[in-house]
Amino acid sequence: MAATAAASVVRYAPEDHTLPKPWKGLIDDRTGYLYFWNPETNVTQYEKPTPSLPPKFSPAVSVSSSVQVQQTDAYAPPKDDDKYSRGSERVSRFSEGGRSGPPYSNGAANGVGDSAYGAASTRVPLPSSAPASELSPEAYSRRHEITVSGGQVPPPLMSFEATGFPPELLREVLSAGFSAPTPIQAQSWPIAMQGRDIVAIAKTGSGKTLGYLIPGFLHLQRIRNDSRMGPTILVLSPTRELATQIQEEAVKFGRSSRISCTCLYGGAPKGPQLRDLERGADIVVATPGRLNDILEMRRISLRQISYLVLDEADRMLDMGFEPQIRKIVKEIPTKRQTLMYTATWPKGVRKIAADLLVNPAQVNIGNVDELVANKSITQHIEVVAPMEKQRRLEQILRSQEPGSKVIIFCSTKRMCDQLTRNLTRQFGAAAIHGDKSQPERDNVLNQFRSGRTPVLVATDVAARGLDVKDIRAVVNYDFPNGVEDYVHRIGRTGRAGATGQAFTFFGDQDSKHASDLIKILEGANQRVPPQIREMATRGGGGMNKFSRWGPPSGGRGRGGDSGYGGRGSFASRDSRSSNGWGRERERSRSPERFNRAPPPSSTGSPPRSFHETMMMKHR
């Protein structure tokens, strides 16, 4: 599918005889960046290694006894390959392309051959994942703010060599470029592999998807059901975007294990989804609404489900899916393992966790009682007059580095569409919201992932469903209805260890959120603008005086047209009509006239940004 085409493809660089052995040069075809890889230590870096700094070799496997997981038959590969004998019948919505990344040697001393499951194999020799693996479990937990409760809980698995995963699965993980487990993976994997129920509370972008998928793959090795009689694993997610992305991860990392997965979501024809179920699927990823529809049609059986995952449980409850979730769970055997992942821990989520889980272990990453933003994201809060928002937005887009992907959030579908029309000509923007059909949404997301449309304008429907790893910036054109949605929106950037930027336009009508926003900013060590503090202090708006961005004006009237003001100059409010876009009074009287693309500038066009250049290239 097109989703996999957007993934990075890594190839070897031309041979460089000046590189010290065993270093090799690699090129990321997506970005064109050259970096260097040491196959002995699995270290990658952008700085060219020099002979004066020889690479550090590590023993094949060296695992601290404090984090060693006992290898039992529970994690061993099956003794026969009957489980996977129907490979040609398996459901796969993605092509069986080769894995990207450098190859791993087979047949070396203490190495691994190419034997499939069922044949004798040994564990993959892996390098040490220093410095994390050099820490004690207690120090690792303190560093990553991991707290656990629920009786005897095993220590975190701080390196991949400590997991005891099958070699084929480890190759998939390593070829994806991961050097060490994320904190949520390190702590949830050993608990899940014990067969215990889990409540995991962690921010978005923490690696939770693999946190439950990989133990699920191991579960499938032990529970060898006939997938034509029904799935063994069920993953419930709030949105179709998130559901399809979970399926993509399941197919990508389960390919070598011949694990089949299908996805059930609304907004698409039921026919292809029903045919996938008839062919058989080990894993079903579904939104609650569509799964309930298919259950009522009696076209799926959940009697074989023994591994249930509720991903973004808080979001599903916010969207009103609790009745559907409870109805689905009634169809699943009570003898099962249940894993719940959530970004927040409100009373509603606690209640459903108490009802559905049995003696769970709770894993917290960071402060659970307070809503906390990702500290890897630099947050910019700007008090902006409604008539100045688009001008400021264009400046932000022009300031981004070449290749940057940007998401802009609006409050309403109407605002989303209008802003997209205004930005398309210059920046290459596309809209995604609830009124778009599934083919339209898929096309927009594929264009965004590939970079052909580098600006995505979205309503909150995409705030928690979209997972694109290289988003550089998020712009809150409209402030959301609460700080929870604010945190989820900006969490689209700064994922998987990367940094990001979030720009938020804050107005007089948003002043009721000022106090809560200050807590979020201070909790993430971010600067709080004086105007926001003033709003919080007096409980009123901060735009009663002239601000840096323009004169006082009325609220944007969420869903109206007033949010699309004239293009006032960033430095001066006297130059608004210089390019034909500054007729604020005409715009307010007849907004329909301004839905067209802007006329050419009478004073000359500014230099093209990367986004404009990309649009010209692809026309």
Curated annotation (Swiss-Prot):
Catalysed reactions, as listed in the record: ATP + H2O = ADP + phosphate + H(+)
GO aspect biological process, one term: rRNA processing
Binding site for ATP: 202-209
Motif (Q motif): 158-186
Domain WW: 17-51
Keyword Secreted: no
Domain Helicase ATP-binding intervals: 189-363
Pfam families, sorted: DEAD, Helicase_C, WW
Bilayer-crossing regions: none
Tissue-wise expression: Ubiquitous. Preferentially expressed in flowers and roots.
Short motif DEAD box, span: 311-314
Annotated keywords: Acetylation, ATP-binding, Helicase, Hydrolase, Nonsense-mediated mRNA decay, Nucleotide-binding, Nucleus, Phosphoprotein, Ribosome biogenesis, RNA-binding, rRNA processing
Region named Disordered: 47-139, 528-619
Induction (UniProt): Down-regulated by abscisic acid (ABA), salt and cold treatments.
MF GO annotations: ATP binding; ATP hydrolysis activity; RNA binding; RNA helicase activity
Keyword rRNA processing tagged: yes
Biased composition (Low complexity): 61-71, 125-139
Name by which UniProt lists this protein: DEAD-box ATP-dependent RNA helicase 14
